[in-house]
Regions:
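Core catalytic lobe of class I
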Residues: 1-130
Length: 130
């Protein structure tokens, strides 16, 4: 069964049973200052890292053994999220997928990178091939 959940991730994740999810696809704010009307994309560094640790810890809790997670992330924080997932939470890195854009994007008078990273990690239990 596929169930899509829409809401604040920290609230919604806490309501999900531990070890009950096979796959998570997450596209959190990239913390690049984009105006979504709620200030969620313009935090100072420490607050953004704490926020990331919080929701990734919940993802780690709800994933089944052998479950996988794909995290879309901007270039500024990919190494930090990798560190949280691999070193802090013990997830196993499978691959780094690059989502390449074919058009130039400009926002706030800045040229945005032509690609974004997707971290593909897994919990123990399956032989994942990247």
């Amino acid at each position: 069964m596929i169930e899509l959940i829409h809401g604040d991730c920290l609230h919604e994740l806490k309501a999900i049973d531990s070890n009950s999810v096979d796959l998570i696809v997450a596209d959190p704010p990239y913390n690049v200052g984009k105006d979504y009307g709620n200030g969620s994309d313009k935090q100072d560094f420490d607050d953004y890292i704490a926020f990331s640790k919080s929701w990734l810890s919940e993802c780690n809790r709800i994933l089944k053994r052998g479950g996988t997670i794909y995290v879309f992330v901007g270039f500024r924080f990919i190494s930090y999220l990798y560190q949280i997932m691999e070193m802090d939470l013990g997830m196993h890195f499978v691959n780094w997928i690059s989502w390449h854009y074919t058009q130039v994007c400009v926002e706030n008078d800045s040229i945005l990178p032509p690609s974004y990273g997707i971290l593909y990690d897994a919990l123990d239990g399956l032989d994942h091939k990247g």
